[in-house]
């Protein structure tokens, strides 16, 4: 039988032939994404077989589904946490139908069945990842094709995986089952809770391989790495300017529209970016939290401190590509470039 999904003959396969279970030891080795993929594969396999009315010799699909995990529970009932064979009655979790060989691992029996039947592996031609069963292969392909077969009945949003739809539904129901034991704040996703818990522990597990800087969240590391690679995937459709993160592009688009959605409550001045408003608000309270270690001078924002520190170090990182002259500040380089272009953007209004 070929490795193409279309060649899998569903009516010749019982659920227990394709149901892949794990011992406790094997399950512990899987990461969360692999466990989620496993659940999706088993659910979809069950639905596919049930939809065509496929039955085993003496059992219904439902019975086969229950019995595939019952064997493993039987062992554990005698041996406690021991995921291996039962010492009291000698029963093992599963048996290969082709050669009657028993095994402590359901996955090993599944591989043995594949060997007997000649059902080959299902290889992804895009990323070369290999799968043993077609439903697992089909679900994986959605990562490449962008197929989204699961639609939310509430808002119509489509998602690629059933677990993603289940998570999305909590937005509508307001369900927040994951609660922080430290402060009581609740979240709709376990991953959001884990991220939040780091604000209490101070843990920063994501480290940049280029400079060693550590981050609390993986997406922050991802954005930071672009400062090293120069990658700017977000492009303005109006002027072609590119940005390393989506929020920067969104702020830039507001500049074209003339939108300034962040007003200062103290004086009413409006800004395009929340960060610009935060810097401005410090001018009202005369706060200068960024202090130079060399001379003690204080600054309202970290970028001003960095510019100032170069007066001590003599560093000039901004170089003109035209003549090679270097400057300590980006704004000074920008002004210098106009000497080459002849640009004179400032006109006297009285003329």
UniProtKB/Swiss-Prot annotation:
<keyword id="KW-0479">Metal-binding</keyword>
<feature type="zinc finger region" description="C2H2-type 2">
    <location>
        <begin position="150"/>
        <end position="172"/>
    </location>
</feature>
<comment type="similarity">
    <text>Belongs to the krueppel C2H2-type zinc-finger protein family.</text>
</comment>
<feature type="zinc finger region" description="C2H2-type 3">
    <location>
        <begin position="178"/>
        <end position="200"/>
    </location>
</feature>
<dbReference type="Pfam" id="PF13894">
    <property type="entry name" value="zf-C2H2_4"/>
</dbReference>
<dbReference type="InterPro" id="IPR013087">
    <property type="entry name" value="Znf_C2H2_type"/>
</dbReference>
<dbReference type="GO" id="GO:0003677">
    <property type="term" value="F:DNA binding"/>
</dbReference>
<protein>
    <recommendedName>
        <fullName>Zinc finger protein 124</fullName>
    </recommendedName>
</protein>
<feature type="zinc finger region" description="C2H2-type 1">
    <location>
        <begin position="122"/>
        <end position="144"/>
    </location>
</feature>
<dbReference type="Pfam" id="PF00096">
    <property type="entry name" value="zf-C2H2"/>
</dbReference>
<dbReference type="GO" id="GO:0005634">
    <property type="term" value="C:nucleus"/>
</dbReference>
<keyword id="KW-0862">Zinc</keyword>
<keyword id="KW-0804">Transcription</keyword>
<feature type="zinc finger region" description="C2H2-type 4">
    <location>
        <begin position="206"/>
        <end position="228"/>
    </location>
</feature>
<keyword id="KW-0863">Zinc-finger</keyword>
<dbReference type="GO" id="GO:0000977">
    <property type="term" value="F:RNA polymerase II transcription regulatory region sequence-specific DNA binding"/>
</dbReference>
<feature type="zinc finger region" description="C2H2-type 8">
    <location>
        <begin position="318"/>
        <end position="340"/>
    </location>
</feature>
<dbReference type="InterPro" id="IPR001909">
    <property type="entry name" value="KRAB"/>
</dbReference>
<dbReference type="InterPro" id="IPR036051">
    <property type="entry name" value="KRAB_dom_sf"/>
</dbReference>
<keyword id="KW-0677">Repeat</keyword>
<feature type="zinc finger region" description="C2H2-type 6">
    <location>
        <begin position="262"/>
        <end position="284"/>
    </location>
</feature>
<keyword id="KW-0805">Transcription regulation</keyword>
<dbReference type="GO" id="GO:0006357">
    <property type="term" value="P:regulation of transcription by RNA polymerase II"/>
</dbReference>
<keyword id="KW-0539">Nucleus</keyword>
<dbReference type="GO" id="GO:0000981">
    <property type="term" value="F:DNA-binding transcription factor activity, RNA polymerase II-specific"/>
</dbReference>
<feature type="zinc finger region" description="C2H2-type 5">
    <location>
        <begin position="234"/>
        <end position="256"/>
    </location>
</feature>
<dbReference type="GO" id="GO:0008270">
    <property type="term" value="F:zinc ion binding"/>
</dbReference>
<feature type="zinc finger region" description="C2H2-type 7">
    <location>
        <begin position="290"/>
        <end position="312"/>
    </location>
</feature>
<dbReference type="Pfam" id="PF01352">
    <property type="entry name" value="KRAB"/>
</dbReference>
<feature type="domain" description="KRAB">
    <location>
        <begin position="13"/>
        <end position="106"/>
    </location>
</feature>
<keyword id="KW-0238">DNA-binding</keyword>
<dbReference type="InterPro" id="IPR036236">
    <property type="entry name" value="Znf_C2H2_sf"/>
</dbReference>
<comment type="function">
    <text>May be involved in transcriptional regulation.</text>
</comment>
């Amino acid at each position: 039988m070929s490795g193409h999904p279309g060649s899998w003959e569903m009516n010749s396969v019982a659920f227990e032939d394709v149901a892949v279970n794990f011992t406790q030891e094997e399950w512990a080795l899987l990461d969360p994404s692999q466990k989620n993929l496993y659940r999706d594969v088993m659910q979809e396999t069950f639905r596919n077989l049930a939809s065509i009315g496929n039955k085993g010799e003496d059992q219904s699909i439902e019975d086969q589904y229950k019995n595939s995990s019952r064997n493993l529970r039987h062992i554990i009932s005698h041996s406690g946490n021991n995921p291996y064979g039962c010492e009291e009655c000698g029963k093992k979790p599963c048996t290969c139908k082709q050669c009657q060989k028993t095994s402590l691992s359901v996955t090993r029996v599944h591989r043995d069945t594949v060997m007997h039947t000649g059902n080959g592996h299902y290889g992804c031609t895009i990323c070369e990842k290999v799968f043993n069963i077609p439903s697992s292969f089909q679900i994986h392909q959605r990562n490449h094709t962008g197929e989204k077969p699961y639609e939310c009945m509430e808002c119509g949003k489509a998602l690629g995986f059933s677990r993603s739809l289940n998570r999305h539904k909590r937005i509508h129901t307001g369900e927040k089952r994951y609660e922080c034991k430290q402060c009581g704040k609740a979240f709709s996703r376990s991953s959001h809770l884990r991220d939040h818990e780091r604000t209490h522990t101070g843990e920063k597990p994501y480290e940049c391989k280029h400079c060693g800087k550590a981050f609390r969240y993986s997406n922050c590391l991802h954005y930071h790495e672009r400062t090293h690679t120069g990658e700017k995937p977000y492009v303005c459709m109006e002027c072609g300017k590119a940005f390393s993160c989506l929020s920067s592009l969104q702020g830039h688009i507001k500049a074209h529209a003339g939108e300034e959605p962040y007003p200062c409550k103290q004086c009413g001045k409006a800004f395009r970016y929340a960060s610009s408003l935060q810097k401005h608000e410090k001018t009202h309270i005369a706060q200068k939290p960024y202090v130079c270690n060399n001379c003690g001078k204080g600054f309202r924002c970290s970028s001003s401190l960095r510019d100032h520190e170069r007066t001590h170090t003599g560093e000039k990182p901004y170089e003109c590509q035209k003549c090679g002259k270097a400057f300590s500040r980006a704004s000074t380089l920008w002004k210098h470039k106009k000497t080459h272009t002849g640009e004179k953007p400032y006109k006297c209004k009285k003329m």
